[in-house]
Amino acid sequence: MKETPLSNCERRFLLRAIEEKKRLDGRQTYDYRNIRISFGTDYGCCIVELGKTRVLGQVSCELVSPKLNRATEGILFFNLELSQMAAPAFEPGRQSDLLVKLNRLMERCLRNSKCIDTESLCVVAGEKVWQIRVDLHLLNHDGNIIDAASIAAIVALCHFRRPDVSVQGDEVTLYTPEERDPVPLSIHHMPICVSFAFFQQGTYLLVDPNEREERVMDGLLVIAMNKHREICTIQSSGGIMLLKDQVLRCSKIAGVKVAEITELILKALENDQKVRKEGGKFGFAESIANQRITAFKMEKAPIDTSDVEEKAEEIIAEAEPPSEVVSTPVLWTPGTAQIGEGVENSWGDLEDSEKEDDEGGGDQAIILDGIKMDTGVEVSDIGSQDAPIILSDSEEEEMIILEPDKNPKKIRTQTTSAKQEKAPSKKPVKRRKKKRAAN
């Protein structure tokens, strides 16, 4: 399923807001979205939320044979999956260009930077080493996947504990967590990716772009850095030309953001370890009980509306007060009335019922003036409006027509019994034939 394209109005609105240094969620140019880290019950499982972008990280390990050219080093493997649950545009089971690019960037950021001591993963040189596998699943896509994935990967690696082993001769003994405490991985530093989106050919810059901003950006710059301000990798995409000053400015901003995120990660790991030692609730169990994972709510963004309120007050002060409109019904004639403004509402005039007589089988219309009918319809004082009209329970159809005159005096009624009472006598008309004189 292809993603829904942006309309021209949405595109122009986003670009105009960026030119005015405004964002849809109320952030400033260099602001990051709120980051939340949750840990699972087992070691090495975590969920990282970057705004509405959610990534699940899971680390696993197994004993395998090492590579031939690196007999004393362990193996580190990364796998990022984009499912349709995150966005309908992602196709399952297909290696898209975006997925390949993200996986390669993760490998350069974490594996090539030597953030993990792979030699400590060796059990028996040339025979047994630990293979560490990091699986990342995108749960919801709202932009900036690489930043959320890098944070989830490094958090899961820091939180992971591998089983302890012992080697006696040719025998390798693997201990369960009940027998011996698991051993954490040896991590030298924590590289974190920071993304910068460029607009209008590098004129405008935004940190941590969301999904809508990514669709209108001209280029993307990703800088992976640790808290020691050591650049691990840099990647530029989009085909834009960046100046040296722009790259240096982005590196300075990335250094500040990485320091803040690293402090947040260390604090989250410390709190989780403290809760586990105390024996309290930890992991997703506590989050599900409080409906923190299953419930999705909109975050409140602080937005300054003072300028808009002042402008609205000025417009209201300069505008003329609205006129009071009172709608009262006006009685023009006993049969007509007008409510509000517009076309008058009145009783409709009815033409002579000649056509109805033909359709009704030749029934005649009888004009009555204050008489009593045999059919059960009593009309006494027609000029008075308060006089009631009494109808009988006769099975014959009865119809009373009201005229819009001020003092209606005639009522036309049509019944089937009237034909029997006053049926006009029709006499045959004889015509004389004239004889022509014979020539």
From Swiss-Prot:
Keyword rRNA-binding listed: no
Effect of mutating residue 14 to P: In PCH1D; reduced EXOSC9 and exosome levels in patient cells
CDD domains to which the protein is assigned, alphabetical: RNase_PH_RRP45
Family annotation (SUPFAM superfamilies): Ribonuclease PH domain 2-like, Ribosomal protein S5 domain 2-like
Basic residues biased stretches: 425-439
Compartments (UniProt record): Cytoplasm; Nucleus; Nucleus, Nucleolus; Nucleus, Nucleoplasm
Keywords attached to this entry: Acetylation, Cytoplasm, Disease variant, Exosome, Isopeptide bond, Neurodegeneration, Nucleus, Phosphoprotein, RNA-binding, rRNA processing, Ubl conjugation
Modified residues (Phosphoserine): 65, 306, 346, 392, 394
Covalent cross-link Glycyl lysine isopeptide (Lys-Gly) (interchain with G-Cter in SUMO2) as placed by the record, residue numbers: 297, 419
Pfam families according to UniProt: RNase_PH, RNase_PH_C
Listed GO biological process terms: exonucleolytic trimming to generate mature 3'-end of 5.8S rRNA from tricistronic rRNA transcript (SSU-rRNA, 5.8S rRNA, LSU-rRNA); immune response; mRNA catabolic process; nuclear mRNA surveillance; nuclear polyadenylation-dependent rRNA catabolic process; nuclear-transcribed mRNA catabolic process; positive regulation of cell growth; positive regulation of transcription by RNA polymerase II
Residues recorded as bearing N6-acetyllysine in the entry: 297
Record region (ARE binding): 1-268
GO terms under cellular component: cytoplasm; cytoplasmic exosome (RNase complex); cytosol; exosome (RNase complex); extracellular exosome; nuclear chromosome; nuclear exosome (RNase complex); nucleolar exosome (RNase complex)
Cross-link (Glycyl lysine isopeptide (Lys-Gly) (interchain with G-Cter in SUMO1)): 297
Residue ranges with Acidic residues bias: 349-361
Single GO MF descriptor: RNA polymerase II-specific DNA-binding transcription factor binding
Ranges where the record places region Disordered: 335-363, 391-439
Origin superkingdom: Eukaryota
Protein role: Non-catalytic component of the RNA exosome complex which has 3'->5' exoribonuclease activity and participates in a multitude of cellular RNA processing and degradation events. In the nucleus, the RNA exosome complex is involved in proper maturation of stable RNA species such as rRNA, snRNA and snoRNA, in the elimination of RNA processing by-products and non-coding 'pervasive' transcripts, such as antisense RNA species and promoter-upstream transcripts (PROMPTs), and of mRNAs with processing defects, thereby limiting or excluding their export to the cytoplasm.
Assembly with partners or alone: Component of the RNA exosome core complex (Exo-9), composed of EXOSC1, EXOSC2, EXOSC3, EXOSC4, EXOSC5, EXOSC6, EXOSC7, EXOSC8 and EXOSC9; within the complex interacts with EXOSC3, EXOSC4, EXOSC5 and DIS3. The catalytically inactive RNA exosome core complex (Exo-9) associates with the catalytic subunit EXOSC10/RRP6. Exo-9 may associate with DIS3 to form the nucleolar exosome complex, or DIS3L to form the cytoplasmic exosome complex.
Clinical disorder: Pontocerebellar hypoplasia 1D: An autosomal recessive neurologic disorder with onset at birth or in infancy, and characterized by progressive axonal motor neuronopathy, severe generalized hypotonia, respiratory insufficiency, and cerebellar atrophy. Death in childhood may occur.
Family stated for the protein in its record: Belongs to the RNase PH family.
Protein name: Exosome complex component RRP45
Organism name: Homo sapiens
Upper taxonomic lineage: Eukaryota, Metazoa, Chordata, Craniata, Vertebrata
Gene from which the chain derives: EXOSC9
